[in-house]
Amino acid sequence: MQINIYSIAKKDAKYQALLEELCMQCKQFGVEIKILNLLPQAVLKAQKISSAKAQQSYTQTFLPYIALPTALNLILHPTGHNYDSQSFAKLIESQHIVQFFIGGAFGFEESFVRLGKSVSLSAMTFNHKIAKLVLCEQIYRALSILHSHPYHK
């Protein structure tokens, strides 16, 4: 299984070690996680203009990545479906490619959200750094469940 996490964000060295540790732990289950932080100039400019322009720029940034027809595309969204750890594990089970999309501060255009399955990590709002950590931990937990590893207990 290949898991790709795309985020509108800069790489942050303070969180990188924790992310790398979680990604490394997933390798024991034959899963490779790639995290791609995207913050092109077009996004930086658009965020200064309006929330609508920012959302459009996020869509344009992510479109080349969501176009993969064989992937399960999961879009993190505050109104997305809430999963417990067991059902999240079932969601990603048997998938060859799973892709997660974490938008910028202004969220996603509805047209982009409809291109995948909307998922919420929590009713609370997290910054991108924390959201990525929580997501990676939940991916590791899901893989632990699927492989009967004691981590989940």
Curated annotation (Swiss-Prot):
GO molecular function: rRNA (pseudouridine-N3-)-methyltransferase activity
Organism superkingdom: Bacteria
Keywords: Cytoplasm, Methyltransferase, rRNA processing, S-adenosyl-L-methionine, Transferase
Reaction catalyzed: pseudouridine(1915) in 23S rRNA + S-adenosyl-L-methionine = N(3)-methylpseudouridine(1915) in 23S rRNA + S-adenosyl-L-homocysteine + H(+)
Any Gene Ontology CC annotation: cytoplasm
UniProt binding sites for S-adenosyl-L-methionine: 75, 103, 121-126
Compartment annotation: Cytoplasm
Enzyme nomenclature, EC number: 2.1.1.177
Main location (coarse class): cytoplasm
Family label: Belongs to the RNA methyltransferase RlmH family.
Function: Specifically methylates the pseudouridine at position 1915 (m3Psi1915) in 23S rRNA.
Quaternary organization: Homodimer.
UniProt protein name: Ribosomal RNA large subunit methyltransferase H
Species this chain originates from: Helicobacter hepaticus (strain ATCC 51449 / 3B1)
